[in-house]
From Swiss-Prot:
This is Phosphatidylinositol 4-phosphate 5-kinase. One of its GO terms (molecular function) is 1-phosphatidylinositol-4-phosphate 5-kinase activity. The keyword Ribosomal protein does not apply. Residues 68-98 form the EF-hand domain. The lineage of its organism: Eukaryota, Sar, Alveolata, Apicomplexa, Aconoidasida. Residues 139-255, 427-479, 895-993 are annotated as: Disordered. Catalyzes the phosphorylation of phosphatidylinositol 4-phosphate (PtdIns(4)P/PI4P) to form phosphatidylinositol 4,5-bisphosphate (PtdIns(4,5)P2/PIP2), a lipid second messenger that regulates several cellular processes.
Amino acid sequence: MKCTSVNIRNVLDISLKKKIKENTNLSDDEIIIIYKRFNYISSNGKLNYDNFEKSLGILGSIQNAYLYKSIFKAFDLNNDNYLDFYEFCVAINIMLKGNKKDKLKLSYRIVNAGFNSNEDACVHKSSCMVNKFNTKEDNNMNGDNINGDNNNNHNNINGDNNNNHNNINGDNNNNNHNNINGDNNNNHNNINGDNNNNNHNNINGDNNNNHNNINGDNNNNHNNSHNNNSHNNNNKAENSLGQPLNEKNINDPINKHRNSQSIIYNINDEYNEKIKKNKKQDYSNYITYENFEKIVLSINDIKRQLLGTGDEIITSQIKYTFRSLSILCDDGIYRMNFECYKKALKCNEFLKLLGIHTKVADVFLQHELLKRKDKNKTKNGTMRNRKKYKNDSNRIANHLIIKSFSESTNTRGSIINDSTSFLFLRKQKKKKKKKKKKKKKKEKKAILYERKSTFSSSMENKSQNKSQNKSHNKNIKSVSRILSRVNKLSSTELIPNECDHKPNEEVKSTSDVLTPIFFNNGDEKMNHDTDGNMVYHKNNVDDNLVDGDVVSQGKRCSFFSSCENKKNEENKSITFNDINSGNINTNSCIMNNMIVTKESNEEIINEEAQSSYIYNKNIFCSKYNTKKDKNEPLKCDLFECSFINNDKNIVRDEDSNHKNVRKTDDYFIIDDNNIFDNGPIIISKNKTNDRERKLLKTFSSSSLKKKSLLKNYNYHIKKKNKDPNVEDTNMLYHDDIKKEYDHKVTKNNKNTCNNNYYNNVSFNSSAYYEYHSDIDLIHFSNNLKKKKKKNVTSPRPSSKEYERKVTYHKECCSNERMKNIKVNESDLGMFCVNNDKTNIEDVKEKKACDVLNRGCIKEQVQCKISEFENDKGNEIYMQEFKKCIEKYKEYVNQGEGHLKDEEEEKNDDEEEGEDGEDDEEENDDDDDDEDGDDDEDGDDDNDDNDDNDDNDDNDDNDDNDDNDDNDDNDDNDEKSNIKIENKKDVPNIHNNNDDDGINCCTNLFKDDDTLSALEKNVTNNNLIKIMSAKYLYHKFLEYKDFMKNNTTLFSHFNKIYQHEDDKINTDNKDVLNYRPKHNNDINYYNIPCEDQIKSDEKKSLLNVEFGDDIIKKKFFISSVNSHYVMINNNLTKEQMLYLIRNILMSIEDYLKKEKNRDYNKIFFLFFSIFIYNTQNGGDQKEMHEDEKWDHTNINEDKNVEKNDDYKNLSNNENSVYYNTMLRESLWNKKKYIKLNIFKNIILVISIVRYFLHTITISQKYTSSYDSLDDSNMIKSMNSLKLNEINILLNRASEILEKYSLGSVENKKVYINKSNYYNSSKKGKLSVSLRQNKQKKTFHRILAVYFGHERWDLVMNMMIGIRISSIKKFSINDISNYFHHKDVIQLPTSNAQHKVIFKNYAPIIFKNIRNFYGIKSKEYLTSVGPEQVISNMVLGNLSTLSELLSEGKSGSLFYFTSNGKYIIKTVCRNIHNLSKKLLPKYYEHIKKNPDSLLTRLYGIHSIKYQNNLGRKKKKIYFIVMNNFFSSIVEIHRRYDIKGSLVGRTVPETKREDHTIALKDVDIDELGDIINIGPENKERLLKVLKADADFLKENMLLDYSLLFGIHYRELSKDVVNWEETKTNQINHIYDYKGNCIASRPFHQCDYGGIISVDKKKIFFFGIIDIFTKWSIKKKFEHTFRTIQKFDGKNISCIHPNAYAKRFVTFIENHMK
């Protein structure tokens, strides 16, 4: 019997309904609908797993899938093996209406095999509801043994972390499992005796002699239920990440203490506190590796069985990802708690395993581990058991470790975007008393260190000095909460076998110096934690040392280091000597994973002939003072650690390099997409099974691309490979790197990098091939050729030189922090060379922040600033620094009073008045004014960005990289169509590409009268760059004058300006009074800093620290390549870092529009760090004229006209001279100064970032390795200097990425769904229609959830399309392509209910998709069900519901996740008509590639059994394009038919931009399609051709879907000055047939940019399948009589309809 709503209300219990409403967001109607569906899929009000599996529809055809079981367990809150209605409502509410937190908890339970923790289970408002409901439904007060589940799970359901059954019922917590099991017989007897106060048996009144009578179980089960091993059931089954676990010794008193939870009375508080510390941590609610692996494999198996395809999943890949995102528990097993899982869901690699696909994740996983198939199967040594250390109560052990990925800046959730930048550690308890710590110092003990690791390629050490004042502690309070008490965070360094302490090394006591290296005695059971409290070791682990060739590789070793904070004491570094006397100065031994004993002047590691490599990370350390025989092998435990013997050539020398390299095609191309990302990942390639023969290849995690590159890029690679000695240029060998850097040092001023490498970043990946059409590739290829012609002026270098350039380009632009490794000719092994002269400087610098953490980088920078300021040695410097800034502000404000904060608001109002409208939705994080915002948008799309979907990241400041006169472009080069510059008019300006990291408004001067004159000579982009460079130089002169006038006040600042001699001053005067008489001999102002550097015999500290390759590095100013800056080598390293930190903080404050922002401070800091300089070049004359105008008050126009030299200039020079005048007249205007400030601030941070990046690739730093191989986990973090630089580099990258628009991350893809408004009609007929509509809407509430009819429909549609699209057909067997029909039977959970899927004309539609450039992979992933299956794991189905909408005809619209395609259900008549018109439609779009008609990508039907009845139901649907899918938002849309009767929307509805306005509204609002005469003619031609096609086929009632994106409302990145409508849009074959199309009206972000550059228009003709039939004729007659207007009504004859349609649109075009 079909239930009505009334019957359901009567059946549903009122109290249950009230309970559901209190704890969910469901309405009464929704509860009733869900109840109806629940009763249909369940039996007797209880839904078991079998019925739940059937409710999944086609997904449930995969029986007993682990994923479905986990989902079922997650829904089952009370663990009774079935779902009642309450649990079902809670689950549906979370998946459809729940907030992000509830969905996250549900997802956590799903992945954790349905385990319900205290937080997770209570998703409703009252946690006690679960117990009450369980008591009512289950009649079980305890439920401990009902499900046979682990006891630990049950305890967590009720919010108790203790493993005690008494807590289940809220009884006294005095009983304990261990005591029950024989730990204390007296206690056990009391439990079962007369004293029933603490007994479970009293609860149910059962026999008191048996503890397990609560559940009515056998009395003999007492020991089993309370056996101590029951707490370890999960641990026994877990062999996480290949680590065998030790069985715990029950008789061991230490274990008993760890597992004990009893409270011992009559003892002192100190002993009781020790007992609490020794409690065992409960990890039962943590996700284990086994659970995660099962989920991943289950998802992949479901996709493989349903779709016939599945991703290639490697177990080691899952292992590596899980381990990198999890924490190491005190029992030596990696687990993932809720916080870890929360962060992991932001990691692309983690989401990829769960089936959430993004381009970044695809690139990462396709290359990360698939190349490891040749990996050595026999691993060196087995994974040993970890030692169990005691820790504080309810805390994870101090040696928690997190493996890390490298960072990535991809916008879709890359690893650096919060996914791996947090530390997964619990809160630390307060520090212990100092007295206890002093007592423990005297004993022989070991200090355990709590280690942390971030997801970055670098680590930073931070020593929190206790002597710091309280104000400083407040500043770092938020940091200290996360970072805890980490004294030193060491990083692995190259450690030779010959590793001694220097005999003359001054070493302080072991408490204040680096923890000595010692041998860990296996018999010793006593150790100490960081607070000096005694903890115990268990002597049940076998640890061995691998020492060169003496000990086999099967053995393991680990070195540990630790150090301790001391008041007023400095840590000394221990120096290790290799056999070649190369010193490696370290602060914390630079060995992460080693335990060695210290003997003051004795050898630590046996001397061997060759040095060895240690590569591992993140192990805690301990120390022990007992002297051992130095030859005694080390005993330690290690998760994964091993040695590589250097006697086997890891890196070949120059003679054997090319001979020993194996030939392989398995190489990777370094992509330049994110140049400054942190964290190299090292992939090791095995030629044989010997580990020693591995070759290390470096590449970035975000740069892992497929082999397929664009042809033009491969052309360069082939050119490089002409050298016969080079077999694989993508392999970066260490000796080659050495050569490259030697080449770089010797030819410092030569630019070896061509800028057009930086302009094609986003195209150098296979993702461009897969997700873009052939048209995009052709545009890219053409532009690349044009740029090549434009930029290549000098003859092509030899193959060797070109190889050096390209390889150096790869090295500079990759994300890795590559540091050279020098190869010793006498020793083929690798060793580091550190030229640091003093250990004191190392010690001071290495007191850095604890962790490189994206979430707290700002706090770390502020922390270091405070530390520098509080240093007593910097008092004088800080006093002068503060005075100098104050004086500078006063000095500058005298000349720039118009830029004060009071005047800025006036300027904003003026600019708003010029624009005509006030932008109320402007982002606060953008520029300072509207012009600045437009400036950012304008320069976003660079010249090579022909594809709208893949724009380059404009954050790259690569135009500052080593520009040189050798790269000057030839004046006679062929003129390019790309708008960069007019070379004929500006002959001396070169390399002015738009990829300079500065986004500016290309339409800034649209209201200026001088714009027309400027456009004739120089493009707007170039003009703005020159203006900004001119303003920067003006600020420099201002700074220089200030420093000269205050030389006596500030003795510590920029001595370069304080000690200039009279000759220099004379030269400066000559410069200011310059007249252009000698054009060829311009002697520009040149600061003699280079001469001082060369002549200064005693180098400063910066020279010692960084070397000449950094000190002499030139950072060129954008657009004026003769101007550059160099680092001020008179600064000390600490001063330089302090100034950089200050400039980063100041820039961010300014860009955030803080109240106290000050741009003058930014320029002051910048010129204090860098010295502005010039060199003789073509741009000097232009800038020199600007200087003259800067320092003269004479009227420019009159002087220029009277100047005889100006009259004698040639035409080109004349235009340059005139343009320079115009620039001067523009840049000094008030409204443009703020633009110049913003552009220069972005330039400043770009230069700072590139300078920091240059340090990381400097010769003085070795490479950072991070191998993905389990046995080769390398984490050589080099030194703390690099880590400090990386912190600042990350901070600079974050600021530049956030505030300089143009990044891919800032892009959004808008689906831009339309809502339909139908005016209500009066009369009885309209009333009945409204009632029917309400009923339909009522039944469509919550259309998608388990068991619902729409769920089956959507799943069947997506899976049917997915399967049919990959099916291959034999063309010879198909007689008629248009009438071909492919029939597929989809799997179902019920064999009797068959689902038939039909795909019509599959070959034709595949050709149509190819015609419009749709790749098969992109189409399948868009319409396929992969995302839905994965979203089930994430506890989220709301996305599916949001993508579903109802059309005005009642049709179901499903938008794909990327918004490009729409699946629309249609009636049978439309279905038949579409098939009938398909041949004509196909021919029409072939002849008219720019057609506006809806693009059909597929016609399908599904026939299935209706769940609500026994009749079979057939659904027809089509797949078509979404005209409004764009990276910009549609602010207004119209649905135009040409009719005026009833074609309007009320004003109250017009505010909703998702509602399509109509014909009358466009006249009232006055919107005009102003696309220019050329585009108007083309559009009208296409429109008439489409109208004729529709007229010929007697079609009507179609409409033009017309959308508008307004510039004034835009928050998206748009290059308004460049349109692509005139580019090549179609490809024709030799017969003249179009084989590929890209309509011109979709070239500009999916539309056409208007002539006034203020709008983007989108067009498309929809609803084209309405036939002129008898029904329409009758409607025409009826409406004519009703409205008394036969012409303006909608339903008219197709001929008249087409004519009216075209005429109406033409009248609204301009």
